[in-house]
């Protein structure tokens, strides 16, 4: 990648964080890098009927209210901190993602702390979009991301978002997501409770999050890409 980036007339990065990483680690000049964000699947932008959501809820035996986490269950996604943060609460956790060896740590913590958790795999894109819409809160305290597409999926699906204050995630989450130190379990616990106990704040942040998500529409990404290509042609 370093050789290709050196030879390229321009380099497209998927976030300002990625741009900084390319400059720092690959020593590519900042002036030849352009940022074009990623979007998400159309399924997350579509509206679902009450009947459709009811079917999804019944199929996966989802609780009436739940905290949602989406992504491969691996160390950098930091799910263990969420499980620890839920200790002593009655807040159900739903996780959609492939299990790795890291899941053993999650199981051990669940057994000790008696956290209510449901783990789902092999979920279709349409079903996943419905699960997002049924969630009370989406949480994504990842330690590092190139961009963080699950955050964008959540913004379009309209649960409020809690995510990390590190890496590129503030770029993806925008002003009205709630941010945590991903290494601070107590901070995560406080932010979860803040939203869980305040439905009005949840609605406000969800509405503002959907407004912010419009910068990640296919149309906007197309315009940004064409701007880069036209720059090369001129």
What is the meaning of each model-derived region?
Residues 1-234:
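Carbohydrate transferase catalytic cores enriched for Leloir-type hexosyltransferases
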């Amino acid at each position: 990648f370093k050789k290709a980036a050196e030879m390229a007339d321009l380099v497209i990065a998927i976030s300002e964080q990625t741009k900084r990483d390319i400059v720092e680690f690959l020593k590519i000049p900042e002036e030849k890098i352009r940022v074009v964000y990623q979007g998400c699947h159309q399924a997350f932008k579509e509206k679902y009927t009450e009947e459709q959501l009811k079917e999804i809820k019944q199929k996966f035996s989802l609780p009436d209210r739940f905290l949602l986490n989406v992504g491969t269950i691996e160390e950098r996604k930091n799910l263990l901190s969420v499980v620890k943060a839920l200790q002593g609460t009655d807040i159900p956790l739903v996780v959609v993602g492939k299990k790795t060896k890291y899941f053993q740590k999650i199981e051990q913590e669940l057994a000790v702390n008696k956290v209510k958790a449901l783990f789902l795999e092999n979920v279709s894109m349409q079903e996943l979009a419905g699960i997002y819409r049924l969630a009370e809160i989406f949480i994504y305290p990842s330690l590092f991301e190139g961009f963080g597409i699950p955050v964008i999926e959540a913004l379009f699906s309209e649960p409020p978002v809690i995510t990390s204050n590190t890496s590129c995630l503030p770029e993806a989450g925008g002003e009205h997501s709630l941010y945590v130190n991903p290494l601070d379990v107590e901070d995560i616990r406080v932010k979860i409770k803040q939203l869980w106990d305040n439905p009005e704040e949840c609605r406000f942040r969800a509405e503002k999050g959907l407004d912010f998500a419009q910068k990640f529409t296919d149309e906007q990404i197309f315009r940004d890409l064409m701007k880069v290509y036209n720059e090369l042609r001129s």
